Amino acid sequence: MKSLKIGLGLLVTVLLFLFVPLPYYISSPGAATSIEEFLTVEGGEKDEGELMMVTISQRRATPFWLVESWVTPFTEANLSSRYLYDGESEADYDRRQQLLMDSSQQAAIQYAYELADEEVAVDFEGIYVSAPIPGSLAANVLKPGDVITAIDGMSFATRMDFLNRVMESDAGDEVELTIERDGEERIVQTLIQPIDQSGDRVGIGIYEPLPVQEIAADPKVDVALTNVGGPSAGLMFTL
């Protein structure tokens, strides 16, 4: 009986060591992958040479991965607060990283097609709220994952259009935001407020507003890239 308890205790300890998440992220060198393995252009021609996309591997730490990072070259552990905004969950963080990657791909396609004098259709859906800034008035009405689709009943066509609309306002102006949350449309009110000590810059009070959009290019571009996020590889995609 005593040996059984010891065995169970050891098993629980091992499982905790291997699987309990810690408030750290482990970063290490990732893979170098040829762009042509996941990006294709309909009717495109293959050139000589090869373009490689280099990635950084990142995972949530467990006690095991944390200890391993201390002895593995080119591997480091950082507190999750370095990557996650206040109030942002791990799922929200993953979603933000995916949107950053989507934006990188879309910007690359748009720029490449402009250089080739080809048109790209953009279906702009809104602005993704990465997280409201703690202490801001927006923190009372917005949550990570919300998508802002209109200001004072007027939609916007690009991220820059959204930013210009906000910056044209004065601190203290009340604005009505149309948002999508969990598949439902809502209307909330907040105030434009200063976002720096000088008071020269104003905003709604959210971190890193990201565009939520889809693009359609002709000839069609297919990017079959999974499990890669972040604002990376834009130059490689464009080339």
Stretches found by the model and what they are:
Residues 96-99, 221-231:
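A short glycine/serine-rich beta->alpha loop
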Residues 138-160:
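Conserved PDZ fold ligand-binding element
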Residues 163-207:
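PDZ-domain C-terminal substructure recognizer with occasional recognition of PDZ-binding tails
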Residues 68, 106-110, 139, 159, ...:
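Extracytoplasmic/secreted envelope proteins and their assembly/folding machinery
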Residues 30-45, 49-61, 80-133, 189, ...:
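PDZ/PDZ-like peptide-tail recognition elements
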Residues 4-22:
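Hydrophobic membrane-insertion alpha-helices, especially the h-region
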Residues 18-35:
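Aromatic-capped interface at the extracytoplasmic side
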